[in-house]
């Protein structure tokens, strides 16, 4: 894993711990990668405002994820988070790269069905109506 990705993973675990969450989820990871230039560029191509996405992800983390009270508990990664990383690494290998990048992680997060992360991202896509030709 590259130093950049390891730093993002560390920040993801720190975010979960700061929120006193039992688990480190893909929503924590999404919150962290939303600050990267690469993901911001991808979101712009998808016509998603990164600030709106970040706001919605942090709202989800604050309001929908239960917190614990014991400061000694270390958050544990979920199976879904592991799957996201495995899928992202496979994506990188298929593209001839040995290391992940944030693009691989974002694609993998979007591939997880029925998750808050996917719902938030898809709900922010601005789909313009097709233009109709007048006969």
Residues covered by each model-derived region:
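Chalcogenol-based redox active-site neighborhoods
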Residues: 135
């Amino acid at each position: 894993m590259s130093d950049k990705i390891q730093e993002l993973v560390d920040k993801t675990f720190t975010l979960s711990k700061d929120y006193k969450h039992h688990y480190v989820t893909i929503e924590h990871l999404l919150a962290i990668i939303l600050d990267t230039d690469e993901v911001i560029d991808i979101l712009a191509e998808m016509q998603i405002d990164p600030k709106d996405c970040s706001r919605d992800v942090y709202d989800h983390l604050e309001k929908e994820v239960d917190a614990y009270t014991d400061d000694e508990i270390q958050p544990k990664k979920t199976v879904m988070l592991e799957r996201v990383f495995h899928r992202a690494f496979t994506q990188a290998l298929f593209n001839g790269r040995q290391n992940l990048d944030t693009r691989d992680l974002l694609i993998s997060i979007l591939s997880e069905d029925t998750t808050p992360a996917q719902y938030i991202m898809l709900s922010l896509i601005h789909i313009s109506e097709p233009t109709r030709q007048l006969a």
